[in-house]
A protein has these predicted regions:
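Exported/extracytosolic protein signature
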Residues: 1-171
């Protein structure tokens, strides 16, 4: 009742917002070295895994097959990140292709599902190699260079050097 003893009527409606549980994961792979890498160069990769959902993730597996990285993170809370590093040494096969692409994959159990559903992501990083240079150098020297007469024996030494950056065959 109001101060004059009149009945007062009204309604109060409550709004309830339900947040639906959702699992999400993100992986980012980076490197500082991106161009003109040579055979034997070591590329250091940083792999950052982040829980972008609104539930804690468990059994998080991070795989980078090229670098033989296989890590497991037991639990990754909402909004949290884990950072891993791994390395790869450039091989001649990479030089022959002109670049090397490396992929990081991540998966985790999806706690919002009753089955074996996983949340997954992957990211890659490509580095370019120096230009392939197939080159050979041949040097020929004699053990005697002057004062020769007909019938003298001369011994030659031939040195063949691969001064390129790829293996040569059938030389």
């Amino acid at each position: 009742k109001d101060p004059k003893n009149n009945n007062v009527h009204g309604e109060d409606k409550e709004t309830v917002t339900t947040i639906v549980a959702g699992a999400g994961i993100d992986v980012l792979k980076t490197t500082e070295t991106k161009e003109n890498v040579k055979v034997g160069d070591t590329i250091i990769y940083t792999i950052t895994v982040k829980n972008i959902g609104n539930v804690t993730l468990t059994n998080v597996k991070v795989d980078d097959d090229e670098t033989n990285l296989h890590e497991e993170i037991a639990e990754l809370a909402v909004g949290k990140t884990e950072t891993l590093t791994t390395e790869y040494t450039i091989k001649e096969a990479d030089l022959l292709k002109g670049s090397f692409t490396n992929i990081a994959k991540v998966e985790a159990d999806d706690p919002t599902k009753d089955d074996d559903t996983k949340v997954t992501d992957q990211d890659d990083e490509t580095v370019t190699t120096e230009e392939m240079n197939a080159h050979i150098k041949v040097e020929k020297t004699a053990d005697v260079t002057s004062g020769l007469e007909v019938g003298d024996e001369v011994t030659y030494t031939i040195v063949v050097t691969n001064d390129g950056n790829v293996t040569l065959y059938n030389v």
